[in-house]
Amino acid sequence: MEIAQVLTQLERWDRAAAVPRLGGMARADGVVIVGRHHWAFARTDGSLTEGTMPVVPSPLRALPFARGLLRLAGSFAPLFRRRGVARGRERLFLAAVILLPLGLAFAPGWVGLVGGIATTLALLAWLLRGRTLYLHGAEHRAIAALEERRLRETWDGTARPSRFSLRCGTNFATLLLPVAVVGGRFWPLPATSVSPLIVSVLALALTMELWTLVQESRRLARVVLLPGLGLQRLTTREPRLGETRVALIALASVLRRELPQ
């Protein structure tokens, strides 16, 4: 997108009565912004990649637990699309990181522990590449600017919305841990070889339901998600204006296609 087009979109949405709910993710070289139907990846080198989100059948969107798992899976779509954000080897790495913990559920205790630590360290190394933490803060700031109708001010640098977000995946992760522990401890059925896998999937689904529920009340969300908000002080850094603009370009691209004039 040309800068003039970006600014037109920002000014348009500053005047909007209602705005769509967007999500996103940060990478070492840019920011991905995700809408219901479209996503965009703006890179720090000025390039832009656009794509569409997978279509979820309407009946499944209203089905408790299934809708959460589908929403979670859909959030990874920009990474795994053939012409998406990640390249071939990176897609394989991410698939391994996602699937390995499920496989470790069947492993002996010490194997699962070692595998879990190795997986966590590998994922942290991937997340901490380049300026990911700064771009993570920029992603949050761009979305907050949309919700506060301060997009143009944020582009100009005269406004600095929060770099912390209630909808950040960090909050989801910190909520998932206690849910998974409690689920494993109080699993009511006789233990079998597949019990750990079932508990893991149900924990993900239940956490998504809880995560969605608490966000309906901003005050409740701030209390329940306080550990995640605290952890964001480690997973985000104060972005430069140029990095915030990268996120705003991705955001403008999604808005232009989600709700065209």
Per-segment meaning from a language model:
Residues 1-80:
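Divalent-cation
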Residues 30, 168, 231:
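Residue-level signature of catalytic and energy-coupling elements of molecular machines
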Residues 36-38, 105-136, 200-216:
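Hydrophobic alpha-helical membrane-embedded segments
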Residues 40-56, 123-155, 211-232:
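Juxtamembrane helix-loop transition segments at the membrane interface in multi-pass membrane proteins
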Residues 62, 66-81, 139, 143, ...:
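Membrane-interacting alpha-helical segments
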Residues 85-104, 161-185, 190:
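Transmembrane alpha-helical segments and their cytosolic interface motifs
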Residues 176-205, 260-261:
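Hydrophobic alpha-helical transmembrane segments and immediately flanking/interface helices
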Residues 217-261:
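Cytosolic/matrix-facing juxtamembrane and C-terminal tails of multi-pass cellular membrane proteins
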